[in-house]
Design a protein with these regions (language model features):
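Anionic-ligand binding patches
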Residues: 1-3, 9-173
Length: 174
């Protein structure tokens, strides 16, 4: 049994698809759990805050992540505030528009340049009793000048991984 510690339906769907079918998966909605306050200063800290909180509330092993987009030209913003850039309802169309507006303001002709970015994911697994593990992954890439693709969620339509011409939003998960 494993609790996926997220209230983000896109994340839940993608994580479930990656796990073996013999693991009984629970979501935070199965326990009517709201997300804890993410007051960490890093993706790693926020990932662990969520995993510990949800594990303690459910008494299950919990896997939680914290992930986001870091854009070099914007001093690594939105960073740990990636979801919050979408406002109260985590509206990623709004967040993407905010990225484009900030880039327009910083470098008016940014669409003709390669804007370096990273996608960061910290993943924590927390066991009842206090044992935990946290790992961090980073994908280098750039920002697309337009939204492209409908696969995935979040910033996927504007993040182009290094070595690709397509956004995450255009690439099927493997």
């Amino acid at each position: 049994e494993l609790l996926i510690g997220t209230n983000n339906s896109g994340k839940l769907r993608e994580i479930k698809a990656l796990l073996p079918k013999n693991i009984k998966i629970f979501s935070t909605s199965d326990f009517n759990l709201k997300s804890p306050k993410e007051n960490g200063k890093t993706f790693k800290e926020n990932s662990l805050i969520k995993a510990k909180f949800f594990s303690n509330k459910s008494n299950l092993i919990c896997m939680s992540d914290d992930s986001g987009l870091e854009i070099k030209l914007l001093n690594n913003q939105p960073g740990i505030y990636s979801a919050r850039w979408g406002g109260k309802n985590n509206n990623f169309d709004k967040a993407i528009n905010k990225v484009f507006k900030k880039l327009d303001k910083k470098v008016p002709n940014w669409k003709n340049k390669k804007i370096k970015a990273n996608f960061i994911c910290a993943l924590s697994i927390y066991w009842p009793g206090g044992k935990y593990i946290t790992k961090i992954g980073k994908i280098n890439g750039s920002i697309s000048s337009t939204k492209a693709g409908t696969k995935g969620f979040g910033y996927d339509p504007i993040f182009i991984p290094l070595g690709s011409r397509k956004t995450f939003g255009q690439i099927l998960p493997k």
